[in-house]
Regions:
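A contiguous strand-loop segment
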Residues: 1-99, 119-138
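A structural signal for well-ordered alpha-helical segments within the folded catalytic domains
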Residues: 100-101, 114
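Second-shell loop/turn segments in exported
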Residues: 102-109
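Short, charged, surface-exposed loops that flank catalytic or proteolytic processing sites
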Residues: 109-117
C-alpha cells in the first residue's frame, strides 16, 4: 500500500511545505522523472486515448517508464498529487483509463487542488476508470 503525507508550511516559523509519497510499484519497474512544459500538447492515455489538450502549467512527474500517467507530481501552481492504489473485488475494465492518467491530466490543467479534484471527477464520470496498472504482475 502507498503512504502519502503532507506537512503544511507555517508563516510564523517560516517552515516549508512538504509532500511525499512512497511507491508500491513492482521493484523492477523503472521510474522516470519527467518535465512537461506548459504550452506543449498532451495526448493522454496509457490504454485508452483521450482527446489531446494544451498543457496549462509546467509539471514535474515521477512515472512508470511504460505509462503515460504518473505516480506523483507537482505543477508550477504548487498543486501536488500522489496516486493511491485501491484494492477491491469489483470487476474493472482491462483497458480503461488509469488513475495515474487522471493524476497527470489534473496537474497539467489545474491551478488549485479544488480544480484538480474536479478535473479528476469530471473525467472519471465521462470516461470511467479501469485498466491494469501492474508491471510484472498485472
Amino acid at each position: 500500500m502507498c503512504d502519502t503525507f503532507y506537512v503544511r508550511s507555517h508563516k510564523d516559523t517560516g517552515s516549508t511545505a512538504f509532500f511525499a509519497k512512497n511507491s508500491d510499484r513492482d521493484p523492477n519497474e523503472p521510474q522516470c522523472m519527467v518535465f512537461v512544459p506548459k504550452g506543449s500538447i498532451s495526448e493522454p492515455g496509457t490504454y485508452v486515448k483521450l482527446p489531446p489538450y494544451k498543457v496549462k502549467y509546467d509539471v514535474w512527474l515521477s512515472r512508470p517508464s511504460w505509462m503515460w500517467g504518473a505516480e506523483i507530481g507537482v505543477n508550477s501552481k504548487e498543486v501536488c498529487i500522489g496516486n493511491e492504489a485501491t484494492f477491491n473485488k469489483l470487476p474493472v475494465e482491462k483497458s480503461g483509463v488509469l488513475g495515474m492518467d487522471y493524476l497527470r491530466m489534473a496537474l497539467e490543467q489545474a491551478s488549485t487542488a479544488f480544480e484538480a479534484m474536479n478535473i479528476i471527477i469530471e473525467n472519471t464520470l465521462s470516461f470511467g476508470q479501469g485498466g491494469d496498472g501492474g508491471y510484472e504482475h498485472p
